[in-house]
Design a protein with these regions (language model features):
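Hydrophobic alpha-helical segments, chiefly the membrane-spanning helices
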Residues: 1-319
Length: 319
């Protein structure tokens, strides 16, 4: 037990430093190309912080643990919205630009509707489903690149001092590597600790593994807040949730198709269909609708999301 605990701590340290460097590199690139931080957060930063989910879900699917791959994707979406974004909003509520949110939010709900449709109709995620999800990923990237090219140039970013471009790319790359390695250490050794305590695999997938692979987003969110980049944090969370459905699930399903887990039930019905997917939609609606309609996020909204996440985890450990 001592070695897993030590490796868990090493992973946490890698995540913290990796998140710091990754945010520095991403914001430097955003200033250099005069791109709004929200758009950078929804693409470049999201890809880097979603690497752990890609690695964990793909490995799980290839080794015959499809329930972990499935639970990790949905669990990470819930964790990102109801824990990470919630912390960001509760600590620093404020205004956001609805126009910058429209593309990632629209893509998320289109992907989520397709994902839920497959789960409720067939329950089997086949290779064609994975290819469709990957096609959505490509379309999302193209739309964001076009948005970046057409984005207006903020005056404050024009006046900001730019560092060496090679340094910014280096910070971005090294930060991403540290995040991926750190999350891998956390998930592997954290799962060993959880199993030693008798926690079921299905619960680990939706809670512990999802939280572990979402730690990069949490570290990036906290680091962004500390550096005064709240827009980057929110954009990262929403972009990461899009990637969890179209990239993470797309890659794992294409390489190793799987079905939704059948080992957990609520009132005799599949727990994922009754609770997991509905909660995923609920927390994302609560997170995004106020931002799109009013252009702002409030502290009560963040607290409500945190309460939902706490209740979700409590139910997972009780069924």
């Amino acid at each position: 037990m001592l070695i897993p605990v030590l490796l868990f701590i090493v992973g946490l340290l890698c995540l913290i430093k990796g998140g710091d460097w990754f945010v520095d590199g991403a914001t430097g690139i955003a200033r250099r190309f005069h791109v709004p931080e929200l758009l950078i957060g929804a693409t470049v930063v999201s890809i880097g912080t979603t690497l752990p989910e890609v690695m964990v879900s793909t490995t799980s699917a290839l080794t015959g643990h499809g329930e972990i791959a499935y639970g990790n994707a949905i669990g990470s979406v819930i964790c990102n919205a109801a824990l990470i974004a919630a912390i960001t909003i509760a600590v620093r509520p404020g205004k956001v630009d609805p126009k910058s949110l429209r593309t990632p939010v629209a893509f998320f709900f289109v992907a989520a509707a397709f994902y839920a449709g497959v789960a409720y109709t067939t329950g089997s995620f086949t290779r064609p489903v994975g290819l469709i999800l990957l096609a959505m990923f490509v379309a999302y990237i193209v739309c964001n690149v076009l948005a970046m090219k057409n984005a207006p140039t903020p005056e404050e970013e024009e006046q900001a001092e730019e560092g060496p471009f090679a340094k910014e790319l280096g910070l971005l790359a090294i930060g991403a590597v540290l995040i991926a390695v750190g999350a891998d250490l956390l998930v592997d050794n954290g799962t060993l600790i959880a199993q030693a305590l008798g926690v079921p695999e299905s619960v680990i997938a939706l809670t512990f593994v999802a939280l572990g692979t979402s730690l990069p987003e949490l570290v990036t969110a906290i680091t962004s807040l500390a550096k005064g980049h709240g827009a980057l944090s929110l954009g990262n969370v929403i972009g990461a949730n899009v990637f969890n459905l179209v990239l993470v699930s797309g890659v794992s399903v294409t390489l190793a198709p799987f079905s939704i887990p059948q080992n957990s039930t609520i009132a005799g019905m599949n727990a994922s269909l009754v609770m997991d997917i509905p909660v995923m939609f609920a927390v994302m609606l609560l997170l995004t609708l106020p931002a799109l309609i009013k252009g702002k996020l409030s502290r009560p909204q963040g607290i409500a999301l945190l309460c939902i996440y706490a209740a979700f985890c409590a139910v997972q450990f009780s069924i």
